[in-house]
């Protein structure tokens, strides 16, 4: 009663010792995934993150988390710098996505033993605040472009004053 959505890691997921009632392969927008599986009953969904179009943009993952039960989704992360960054992992945890791995062998374990918040709390960064600095102009061969820089700064909390 499991489903699989694969792209880059389709070959690795094909060797997985798990029964799938439905398997799709390719790159999909979050809307396409939601439409295809919103009225489809399944136990767990194994989702290759590369199957989500523009997956490095965390808002695409957020769109899935708002419209699907993420406790049923096991996210197979790729080896890119973006998806392995502490900030990206923290945002996954903030969205309620606790079942993610970079290891294909861990998928079977996560199907039988899903993670809770306690299992992934070490990835959650609570004291980081995003600030938006003023746009910075860069000149590239006479073409001007405006780039907004994002800076992470630790938030200071005052507990008490004596």
Where are these regions (language model features)?
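Walker A/P-loop phosphate-binding motif and the immediately C-terminal alpha-helix
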Residues: 140-162
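Long, basic/Gly/Ser/Thr-rich N-terminal segments
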Residues: 1-138
């Amino acid at each position: 009663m499991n489903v699989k959505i694969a792209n880059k890691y389709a070959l690795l997921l094909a060797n997985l010792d798990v029964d799938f009632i439905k398997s799709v392969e390719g790159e999909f927008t979050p809307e396409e995934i939601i439409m295809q599986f919103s009225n489809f009953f399944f136990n767990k969904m194994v989702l290759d993150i590369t199957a989500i179009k523009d997956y490095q943009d965390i808002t695409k993952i957020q769109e899935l988390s708002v419209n699907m039960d993420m406790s049923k989704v096991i996210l197979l992360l790729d080896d890119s710098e973006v998806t392995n960054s502490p900030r990206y992992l923290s945002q996954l945890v903030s969205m309620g996505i606790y079942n993610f791995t970079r290891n294909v062998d861990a998928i079977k374990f996560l199907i039988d033993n899903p993670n809770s918040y306690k299992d992934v709390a070490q990835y959650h960064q609570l004291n980081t605040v995003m600030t938006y600095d003023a746009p910075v102009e860069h000149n590239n061969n006479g073409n001007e472009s405006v780039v907004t820089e994002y800076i992470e700064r630790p938030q200071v909390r005052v507990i008490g004053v004596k």
